[in-house]
Swiss-Prot record:
One of its GO terms (molecular function) is transferase activity. Belongs to the phenylalanyl-tRNA synthetase beta subunit family. Type 1 subfamily. This is Phenylalanine--tRNA ligase beta subunit. It comes from Staphylococcus aureus (strain USA300). Binds 2 magnesium ions per tetramer. Residues 39-154 form the tRNA-binding domain. PANTHER family: PHENYLALANINE--TRNA LIGASE BETA SUBUNIT (PTHR10947:SF0), PHENYLALANYL-TRNA SYNTHETASE BETA CHAIN AND LEUCINE-RICH REPEAT-CONTAINING PROTEIN 47 (PTHR10947). InterPro entries: aa-tRNA-synth_II/BPL/LPL, B3/B4_tRNA-bd, DNA-bd_dom_put_sf, Fdx_antiC-bd, Fdx_antiC-bd_sf, NA-bd_OB-fold, Phe-tRNA-ligase_IIc_bsu, Phe-tRNA-ligase_IIc_bsu_bact. Residues 708-800 form the FDX-ACB domain.
């Protein structure tokens, strides 16, 4: 946003230099990126009056002009501009003058004719060709109003000015207008802000007699209003208005279009001017575009519309693409006499999608995208009516034709002086705080200690108490707040939360087991999004992914861990042991946020123990991976059980579900050989646990158990069972009948082969007995052992 100091003075008067103002604004959080001085590098530039023009005797394209520059005698200047003529007021660079680019003006002879100065174009005095009125693009600038020869040309052009260029953050859309900036400056200097004139002399004729407005979807268009102005005269706008537009980076067109742009910059409220007679009906209908509907915009481009686009129509045909660009046949032309002025509120998301899809970014669309101030919609239209009456001889019809609701102009937020002072660490009185809010243009209501701040709609960045605290600190001055130690109501010693403590314990266990922690992307390809998922739900896909490999939110940590293992193995690091604690995401119903669940996953491949002179090589296998998982359960004081399972992507015979309190909380298994081969991996084992589920059950500590005072007893038992019976089922039966003296069990041998029937296997299990209160006797242990054996026989086992 470009802010002219000359224009700013119309609303707020301060006694300070522009450089100081820019510094103060920057210190409050609005960065002034540049300070543009239009007088820089310019010297001896005056207004001249061309008294006569004659053709150069030796050059067809040159003219010899006698120019009055306010001195005793006119000066002779040779000029090659095609539009120079007698009777014009022009810009003259005198001899000894200087122009941008280091150009110095000297006396010269051009084809034998003396030339004492230079008649200038706007481009030659530093104005970008992008902003020069088209009538002066290829020639000198000619004043449209009489001037006094010899006066300062920059003053006559309203260019003796300095312009601040703001680098605004998206939340400060209020500073995208002169009035919004004026409120900010008035607050900084504790002075009043004067708003511009908006009252017109209206005709007795009502706009309601000539126009109706209908909104079909108020969710997309909450409010639409229009006013009508008759008998406008299309001509160039005043010099001062053209200059302000040029300094703001907008090319002047004519008085009607310029007034629309001027009010846009003044209020931050985009307007659109329609040629009333070209609309083709007395109704305006605002609706969603029809599928396949087309319209030609002001840039003479035919646009194919989507149903998500908002269009302004005459009841049948689109006459404007809402908030983005007008239509060609209803635009204001030189012959236009009657004007319809549009002021509206459009859905920011719809405008952003339309403007980006069609690559039609404009001053208007950028403001609609950020949200506009409801308080200024009607006021901006009234301002345009006043300017059309004043500078286009327009006749303003009374009444406003509107549909929809403007919505609230203010948002009340309650706060106390104590809350503000505790946050910024400085004592300000309630009166001082209220004064700052009033400086910002915020009305306040006081009820004992509570200050109710009525935040105007132009400040959409202020929604909570902390935003108000920031405003107080900004306006008071960050540099003026003394440095103090923070004050706390209650001081507590720092410590880890219960979850942080448990998470740290798990990480220590895994790192102690030789695993390295990995952190991988939350985004995966759409194909991998549901791989290894424990809850097969619809994928959550990005609307505009940067790549196909990162198009969806993951439902498992394993796809990227497998990728990481493959990456390491390909680079000769063949012994890979990784774990990750991270979030996975599961979709819910339409309009609901997805579930975010924390998982713990691991992958192991290669050798667990490297072959050294004192150690034998130990390759990763299922039981090693299971041992890692069991160490996690022990650390969290949990008891896992395992159940054979078939899971896509894992070996069909070497995979198990992990259960906690009879609920599946994870799985463990060998990577399917085909998947392993696809990733250039040898035998690889993975596990995945619902970490949130573990945290919900884990007490996080282990009860102290004293060292046994009495000796224990061990008994071994060998069982012949069907080969399909898992050892876990046998152990479950043993523990169910072992009473309180059976402490633990250990499978120490499994045999299949010679001396056993086909389809059978032999399992040897050691049972450890202990009573913490007394010495066990053989009779007591034998009785329990007999009960266990009877239960096993009933299960189909044969005691060997």
């Amino acid at each position: 946003m470009l802010i002219s100091n000359e224009w700013l003075k119309e609303y707020v008067t301060i006694d300070d230099s522009v450089s100081n103002l820019a510094e103060r604004i920057t210190r409050t959080g609005i960065e002034v990126d540049d300070l543009i001085d239009y007088t820089k590098d310019i010297k001896n530039l005056v207004v001249g009056f061309v008294k006569s023009k004659e053709k150069h005797p030796d050059a067809d394209k040159l003219n010899v002009c006698q120019v009055d520059i306010g001195e005793d005698e006119p000066v002779q200047i040779v000029c090659g501009a095609p539009n120079v003529d007698a009777g014009q007021y022009v810009i003259v660079a005198k001899v000894g003058g200087r122009l941008p680019g280091g150009i110095k003006i000297k006396r010269a002879k051009l084809r034998g004719e003396r030339s004492e100065g230079m008649i200038c174009s706007l481009q030659e005095i530093g104005i970008s060709s992008n902003y020069i009125p088209k009538s002066f693009e290829s020639g000198i600038y000619v004043f449209s109003e009489a001037q006094v020869p010899g006066t300062d040309a920059l003053q006559a052009l309203y260019l003796d000015d300095q312009v601040m260029e703001f680098d605004l953050t998206p939340n400060r859309a209020d500073a995208l207008s002169m009035i919004g900036t004026a409120y900010e400056v008035a607050a900084l200097y504790n002075t009043k802000m004067t708003k511009p004139e908006t009252t017109s002399n209206e005709l007795d004729l009502s706009a309601n007699d000539e126009l109706t407005v209908t909104i079909e979807n108020e969710d997309k268009v909450p409010y639409y209003s229009a006013r009508v102005v008759h008998d406008v005269t299309i001509e160039p706008s005043p010099i001062w208005m053209q200059a302000r537009l040029i300094k703001a980076g907008i090319r002047p067109i004519n008085n009607v279009v310029d007034i629309s742009n001027y009010v846009l910059l003044e209020y931050g409220q985009p307007l659109h001017m329609f040629d009333q007679d070209a609309i083709g009906s007395q109704q305006i209908v605002v609706r969603q575009a029809n599928e396949g509907e087309k319209m030609t915009t002001l840039d003479d481009t035919e646009r194919e519309l989507l149903t998500s686009d908002i269009v302004i129509t005459n009841g049948q045909t689109p006459i404007a693409l809402a908030g983005v660009m007008g239509g060609d046949f209803s635009e204001v032309k030189e012959q236009t006499s009657n004007i319809v002025i549009e002021g509206a509120i459009f859905d920011p998301v719809s405008i952003r999608h339309t403007s980006r899809r069609l690559n039609l970014r404009s001053e208007s669309s950028s403001r609609f995208e950020k949200g506009i101030a409801t308080e200024f919609v009607d006021e901006a239209v009234d301002r345009a009516c006043y300017l059309l009456q004043t500078y286009a001889n327009g006749k303003v019809l009374k009444d406003r034709v509107s549909s929809g609701e403007l919505g609230a102009f203010i948002t009340p937020i309650d706060i106390t002086a104590d809350k503000i002072n505790r946050t910024i660490g400085f004592d300000l009185s309630q009166n001082d705080i209220v004064t700052i809010f009033n400086q910002l243009g915020f009305d306040t209501e006081i009820n004992d200690d509570v200050i109710t701040v009525l935040v105007p709609s132009r400040r959409k960045d202020i929604t909570i108490k902390e935003d108000l605290i920031e405003e107080v600190a900004r306006i008071y001055g960050y540099d003026d707040i003394p440095s103090t130690l923070p004050v706390f109501d209650k001081v507590t010693s720092g410590q880890l939360t219960d979850r942080q403590y448990k998470t740290r314990m798990v990480k220590e266990v895994l790192e102690g087991a030789g695993l390295d922690q990995a952190i991988t992307y939350s985004l995966v390809s759409k194909e991998d999004a549901t791989a290894f998922s424990m809850q097969q739900r619809q994928t959550i896909d990005l609307l505009m992914p940067m790549s196909e490999a990162h198009a969806s939110l993951r439902q498992s940590l394993l796809p990227h861990l497998i990728e990481a293992a493959s990456y390491n193995v390909a680079r000769k690091n063949k012994d890979v042991k990784l774990f990750e604690i991270g979030n996975v995401f599961f979709a819910n119903g339409e309009g609901e946020l997805p579930d975010q669940v924390e998982y713990l996953s691991g992958i192991l491949t290669g050798d667990y123990v490297v072959n050294q002179w004192q150690d034998k090589k130990e390759t990763v296998d299922f039981y090693l991976a299971k041992g890692v998982v069991d160490r996690v359960s022990e650390k969290l004081n949990l008891e896992f059980s395992y159940r054979r399972a078939d899971i896509d992507g894992l070996h069909p015979g070497r995979t198990a579900e992990i259960l906690l309190e009879n609920k599946v909380v994870g799985f463990i298994g060998e990577l399917h050989p085909i998947l392993a081969a696809d990733n250039d991996l040898k035998r690889t084992y993975v596990f995945e646990l619902n970490f949130d589920a573990l945290m919900a059950v884990s007490v996080g500590y282990i009860n102290y158990q004293p060292i046994p005072r009495f000796p224990g007893m061990s008994r071994d038992i060998a069982l012949e069972v069907d080969q399909n019976i898992p050892a876990a089922d046998l152990l479950s039966t043993i523990h169910a009948h072992g009473g309180n003296i059976l402490k633990d069990t250990l499978v120490f041998d499994v045999y299949q082969g010679e001396h056993l029937e086909k389809g059978k296997k032999s399992i040897a299990i050691r049972l450890n007995y202990l009573d913490t209160e007394e010495t066990l006797t053989d009779e007591r242990v034998s009785k329990v052992q007999a009960e266990i054996e009877a239960a096993l026989i009933e299960q189909g086992a044969v005691i060997r």
